Amino acid sequence: MAPIGDDASQTLHDLVNKLESRVKELEDKLAHAAGGPAPAASESVRMILMGPPGAGKGTQAPKIKEKFSCCHLATGDMLRSQVAKKTPLGREAKKIMDQGGLVSDEIVIGMIKAELEGNSECKGGFILDGFPRTVVQAERLDAMLAERNQKLQHAVELQIDDSLLVSRITGRLVHPASGRSYHRVFNPPKADMKDDITGEPLVSRSDDNADALKKRLVTYHAQTAPVVGYYQKTGIWSGIDASQEPGAVWKSLLGVFDKQKGANGSILSKITGRS
């Protein structure tokens, strides 16, 4: 087949642009007629952020939130918020927790749905942190999003070797009076175990016990492996080396987002391979 000439290519380009505009109009009308939410803007994100304790989720999530003007839904925070607001779901969750039970998947999914519908920050998309933890939860999340004519774009896992993670976490030191923090390896004090400013003794954080952390990591990997497998099959999983400096991790995240943007190219780019 002969290559398409420049004139013919431009004509095709113009025609496809008109078709894409028309398709967008029809999609908007169908969504409105069905009473569903309007399609999200192209510059939005719907993602899950996974990673073991200390991998850097707390550092990267605010950056993602700022870039996309989206909401960050950490399940623990969300649960406490719903309980504090005394919403129907919050009251139901509190009753279960007061009895020592575990909050059901249905309640958590309901809380996520309530945030997506009522939280104005979620118009730019969302970052889910701490959910799903099982394949069943992942399937129920997909079903809820499908009801909203949405689907996840990314499942990003911040990956780091357990031994490095243990040294990163257990090496943390703090000056109790001021809150100044140090690290035995990455940011050591000038004098061993002494605060640089006052010379007072530093202490290890009580929640940074190596044995306790190792147990948490065993649980994390056992829970996460099947969920990672689920999202690998759907094609939205990405793994990022979290042992890098935070700036390098952020650059890797931007690469994931740019790759998705390229994958969602125009009809013309899919036909011709040109953007």
UniProtKB/Swiss-Prot annotation:
Please give the name of this protein: Adenylate kinase
**What SUPFAM superfamilies is this protein classified in?**
P-loop containing nucleoside triphosphate hydrolases (SSF52540)
Q: Which NCBIfam families match?
A: adk, PRK00279.1-3, PRK14527.1
Residue numbers binding AMP: T75, R80, G101, L102, V103, G130, F131, P132, R133, Q137, R205, R216
User: Which organism's genome codes for this protein?
Assistant: Botryotinia fuckeliana (strain B05.10) (Noble rot fungus)
Q: Which reaction does it catalyse?
A: AMP + ATP = 2 ADP
Q: What is its main location?
A: cytoplasm
What is the similarity comment for this entry?
Answer: Belongs to the adenylate kinase family. AK2 subfamily.
Subcellular locations according to the entry = Cytoplasm, Cytosol; Mitochondrion intermembrane space
BP terms from Gene Ontology: ADP biosynthetic process; AMP metabolic process; ATP metabolic process; DNA replication initiation; pre-replicative complex assembly
> Disulfide pairs?
none
Renumbered to this chain, region (NMP) spans: 74-103
Gene Ontology molecular function, alphabetical:
adenylate kinase activity; AMP binding; ATP binding; DNA replication origin binding
Which residues are noted in the entry as ATP-binding? G54, A55, G56, K57, G58, T59, R172, S181, Y182, Q244
Q: Which UniProt keywords apply?
A: ATP-binding, Cytoplasm, Kinase, Mitochondrion, Nucleotide-binding, Transferase
Q: Which domain of life is it from?
A: Eukaryota
One Pfam family linked to the record? ADK_lid
How it assembles, according to the record, is: Monomer.
Q: What is known of its domains?
A: Consists of three domains, a large central CORE domain and two small peripheral domains, NMPbind and LID, which undergo movements during catalysis. The LID domain closes over the site of phosphoryl transfer upon ATP binding. Assembling and dissambling the active center during each catalytic cycle provides an effective means to prevent ATP hydrolysis.
Function text: Catalyzes the reversible transfer of the terminal phosphate group between ATP and AMP. Plays an important role in cellular energy homeostasis and in adenine nucleotide metabolism. Adenylate kinase activity is critical for regulation of the phosphate utilization and the AMP de novo biosynthesis pathways.
According to the UniProt record, where is the region LID? Answer: 171-208
InterPro entries per UniProt: Adenyl_kin_sub, Adenylat/UMP-CMP_kin, Adenylat_kinase_CS, Adenylate_kinase_lid-dom, AK2, P-loop_NTPase
Coiled coil segments of this chain? none
Q: Which HAMAP family match?
A: Adenylate_kinase_Adk, Adenylate_kinase_AK2
